[in-house]
Amino acid sequence: MQDGRTTLSKFLIDTLDRQPCSTETARNAGLSALLIDVAAAIKSISAMLTKGALGGNYGSAQSINTHGEEQKKLDVATNEIFVQQCEWDGLLAAMVSEEMESVYAIPPGYPRGDYLLAFDPLDGSSNIDINGVVGSIFSVLRNGEGNGNANEKNGSDPRGTVGESAFLRPGCEQVAAGYAVYGPSTMLVLSVGNGTHGFTLEREIGNFVLTHSNIRIPEDTVEFAINASNERFWEPPVRRYVQECKDGRSGCRASDFNMRWIASMVAEVHRILMRGGVFMYPRDSKTPAMEGRLRLLYEANPMSFLVEQAGGLSITGRERILDVVPRALHGRVPVILGSKHEVERIGRYHGEYDRGEDQPFTSPLFSRRSLFLPGFTA
């Protein structure tokens, strides 16, 4: 007897598997099965995290990942869960993870499929020791889609080994993206290109149930998230925007803003999807050689896909993130995403600054800021 609720499996069947074209139906059936695998990995991670310190997975793994960061035991364990859940059933050609330096090839004993999976198995792992909110992020591409000869142009050699270039495609080519947020409840937020939808894990029976259909981000907001400790390293357009927000009712925005920061991209983006806001991890001068802080393939791209599908915008400050062509597996970009009108404003400030047209503003830290200082001539 049906209870009228839509499970993740039913949603994927209704959305992907019932297409008039038999070829497309077959391809989408593979995508549905892959997303069910990802959901199974998320359930396992949720169960592991629920045990907390009792599970024996807290603390350092005594290893360093490809980014030079100390790995926690849970970073390693959650990465293994994703790999083991998704490698065996012939749906994937290869995987990329924040915790793995190079492309993970599907082992020879398993069949190879049509999709590529990029993921961050545990976003915000620095919050684990304080029992804070963490998450998982994932992105799905079709192997070789839009790249002509699969062996020559998608990073595959004649033996069928998938190389880095298979993944180095703009985020607009994603066929699915999502994240899990492990909070008081576990939620899976997903898009397959027909809007952004949220599913809540019903632990008693192990199903993800559709609870947030067709999420829409409000176009206007009075809330922003940024790590203010880096203010001295920000570019002037970001300092200008944040100062205007901090000035509140007495400033040019004539409105009071709230500032947030959780140190977990999943938690920040989830809040924006639920009630609006802007998330900023902008370019800065702290490490000049670094273009940004967040990884494009498995952080910025999937989150940007979800945000755009929900009516928001996502930019580097100067261009749409989903149009950026990756140059490396673990390449980074600045990220500014969220409510449409505020992201447009921040993008406009970057344009004005680059053209030398930015307006002066007063900052307690930086004093007056403008290219048009007294005595300045072009």
Curated annotation (Swiss-Prot):
Residues annotated to bind substrate: D123, G124, S125, S126, N227
Catalysed reactions, as listed in the record: beta-D-fructose 1,6-bisphosphate + H2O = beta-D-fructose 6-phosphate + phosphate
Subunit comment: Homotetramer.
Organism: Paraburkholderia xenovorans (strain LB400)
Protein's pathway: Carbohydrate biosynthesis; gluconeogenesis
Molecular function (Gene Ontology), one example: magnesium ion binding
Protein name: Fructose-1,6-bisphosphatase class 1 2
Record keyword Transcription regulation present: no
